[in-house]
Amino acid sequence: MQKEFGDYILGPFPENPSLTQSVIGQDQEGTKITTSVVIERPLTIFLNVQEIVTVMTVGDYPDMLAVGFLLNQNMLRMDDEIISIDYDSDIDVVVVRTKRETNFEQQLKKKTLTSGCAQGTVFGDLMEKFEKISIKSSTILKTTWLYSLSQKINSTPSLYLKAGAIHGCVLCREDQPLVYMEDVGRHNAIDKIAGYMLSLIHISEPTRRRG
């Protein structure tokens, strides 16, 4: 995996044929051209036996997207033991199973549509908890790191460079990019990174894939 993505632990895979398709169009001068566009598909996320949400996604890293979404919605806790993750590509469903029994029927009734180009959804009282989040005052962020990161990230082969119309988020350590995720919604890309980070702690079994 490290070799495939160069300096990244995980990164974009623009040559994956399932993520883009070729279309015929016209450029700004009216000339007929063939170009690539990103494919968008639904993914339904279950937590144990309960259907939580269907999100629109580019389709890579569905297991990390599901785990990260549930974590960022406060449906998964940091100390939860994830027993298994099952992904069925035929029906575009991910099932995350935990040792703890869960029931979010009441929380799912309270839905907030967030603003932005890709209107997202948050459940329950999540918006009220944002005020409690703070960054440690000892955190250091250097502008030289940002310039270096910008150069590295912008030159990385990606779906954005191949097809455009997609968002990207990158997990970094100082001036080194580690995990680069892309998706049709920036919140999806962030959820994938969160899912990756949680998987380092709590997921011992690999995702079971069908289809």
Residues of each region from the PLM?
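A short, polar/charged loop-to-alpha-helix boundary motif
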Residues: 187-198
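Short, flexible, glycine/charge-rich loop motifs used to bind or transfer phosphoryl groups or to couple energy/partner
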Residues: 159, 198-199
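Positively charged, proline/Ser/Thr-rich regional signature most characteristic
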Residues: 177, 182-189
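Intrinsically disordered, low-complexity regions enriched in acidic/Ser/Thr/Pro/Gln residues
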Residues: 2-174, 179-180
